[in-house]
């Protein structure tokens, strides 16, 4: 199955011996290797802690072409990468192509949060994660998305299981990462590590509530967009 969303830069980077040797080292030294799709450092922190304390060897895969704008994407990715480096956990950097992601959700722009647009978004990200797991020869993958109270677990599960059907040799670890005190621990690690705490889910379609915030409370690189968004909402227009 070919997909325009498969991270080509990531695929070429996997040819490097350094990455393979690092992942192989983790896989052979631990009981259970697992690929963790990560949306950000805060959502990954408690999950990574739990995994490493319970006999798992996580490799983090960062593939989130939904995040808007590019500066926000880089902020989240760089922080996640730095945190993995601090913990000594392998980090795989997927491609960022927001324009292609927009094609995947075309026609769903006005869907509410937790609606069909989110399901399509999960499909893109879970397929790329399954392909990454297959290439790294890691059977099981899971995602930090299943730790968010703002996401529907049934949509995530459906997207992941579809990805498994398209990617032989992989298995989705259907774990509810909200349970077991992990939500509380996430908050503790957020404060302890001084993580950047984002104000919106990721894509531009999840930014509507930001129009109610004072401009000075927003990152400088989204203020103009949020202003345009507020004007578009007042006129019932499509997002810029």
Where on the chain are the PLM-derived regions?
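Nucleotide-activated chemistry modules centered on ATP-dependent adenylation/adenylyltransferase
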Residues: 28-240
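Glycine-rich phosphate/adenosyl-contacting loop at the front of the ribokinase-like
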Residues: 8
């Amino acid at each position: 199955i070919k997909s325009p969303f498969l991270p080509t830069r990531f695929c070429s980077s996997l040819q490097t011996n350094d990455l393979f040797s690092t992942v192989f080292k983790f896989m052979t030294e631990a009981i259970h290797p697992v690929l963790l799709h990560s949306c950000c450092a805060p959502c990954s922190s408690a999950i990574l802690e739990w995994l490493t304390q319970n006999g798992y060897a996580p490799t983090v895969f960062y593939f989130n072409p939904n995040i808007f704008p590019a500066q926000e994407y880089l902020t989240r990715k760089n922080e996640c990468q730095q945190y993995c480096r601090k913990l000594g956990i392998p980090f795989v950097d997927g491609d960022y192509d927001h324009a292609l992601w927009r094609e995947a959700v075309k026609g769903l722009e006005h869907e509410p949060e937790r609606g069909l647009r989110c399901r399509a978004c999960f499909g893109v990200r879970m397929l790329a994660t399954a392909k990454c797991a297959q290439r790294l020869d890691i059977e099981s993958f899971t995602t930090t998305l299943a730790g968010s109270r703002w996401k529907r677990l049934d949509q995530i599960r459906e997207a992941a299981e579809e990805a498994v059907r398209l990617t032989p040799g992989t298995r989705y670890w259907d774990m509810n990462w909200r349970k077991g005190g992990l939500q509380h621990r996430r908050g503790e690690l957020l404060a302890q590590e001084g993580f950047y705490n984002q104000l919106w889910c990721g894509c531009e379609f999840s930014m509507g509530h930001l129009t109610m915030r004072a401009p000075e409370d927003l990152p400088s690189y989204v203020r103009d967009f949020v202003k345009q968004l507020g004007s578009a909402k007042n006129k019932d227009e499509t997002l810029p």
